[in-house]
A protein has these predicted regions:
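Long, charge-rich amphipathic alpha-helical coiled-coil "stalk/tentacle" segments
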Residues: 192-214
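N-terminal regulatory modules in eukaryotic regulatory proteins
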Residues: 83-84, 92
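Amphipathic, coiled-coil-like alpha-helical scaffolding segments used for oligomerization/assembly
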Residues: 91-114, 118, 123, 127, ...
Length: 214
């Protein structure tokens, strides 16, 4: 009986070894490892070879933390709208009130990375919607403090920096684990129905400036 049991014991030993070795895992240079024990956070590991208790006790999530993600606000690229070309405008996101009570139609993109994988995975449900909502709040706040002339001309870069800073503050308050790397204005115009009249006013103003300088 003892002879017949040896293959079984040997087979079980091999299975245990294979199971134990399944706990080895590698975190790539562009990742962070988030170790979960029965679904609860244990610790975060950095790039390299690591070990965790095998399934069903622990598992590891490895989100890409150096990948630059992009969220578009006020518009959707053709690839997202099913159109063959151009962009689809989203007025409910893009139309904003300026400090001098004009309306501006502004499209912009927010670029972001994961700075804390544990917070990113556990504190927010939808990263895209979270970034969009935070940046829209920030943009509306900043636009409301600026005159339309400033928004459409030399003030853009300063506005982008301020929006990035406020968006980051909001995301940090959420404990989102997200780092905003850039806010980039894609387009800023008066609404379509008044754009021609606005451009006429701008041209007249430029003519007056030229006349003064001559």
């Amino acid at each position: 009986a003892s002879v017949g049991g040896k293959p079984i014991i040997f087979g079980l030993t091999i299975l245990v070894i294979v199971w134990a070795l399944s706990g080895l895992y590698r975190v790539l240079p562009d990742e962070q490892g988030v170790v979960l024990r029965f679904g609860k956070y244990v610790n975060t590991t950095q790039p390299g070879l690591h070990y965790h208790f095998p399934t069903p006790f622990e598992r590891v999530l490895t989100p890409k933390v150096t990948k630059v993600n992009r969220v578009d606000v006020g518009f959707r690229p053709a690839s997202d709208t099913g159109r063959s070309s151009g962009v689809g405008n989203v007025p409910e996101e893009s139309l904003m009130l300026t400090g001098d009570e004009n309306i501006v139609d502004i499209n912009y993109s927010v670029f972001w990375v994961i700075k804390d994988a544990q917070k990113f995975l556990f504190n927010i449900q939808s990263p895209i919607e979270t970034v969009k909502a935070a940046s829209e709040t920030a943009m509306r706040e900043v636009i409301a403090k600026n005159r339309i002339q400033n928004i459409l001309t030399e003030g853009r870069s300063k506005i982008e920096i301020e929006v990035q800073e406020i968006t980051q503050i909001i995301l940090d308050e959420y404990g989102s684990g997200i780092q905003v790397t850039q806010v980039q204005t894609q387009q800023a115009d008066p609404p379509e129905q008044v754009i021609d009249a606005f451009r006429d006013v701008q041209a007249a103003r430029a003519d007056r400036e030229r006349s003064k300088n001559e």
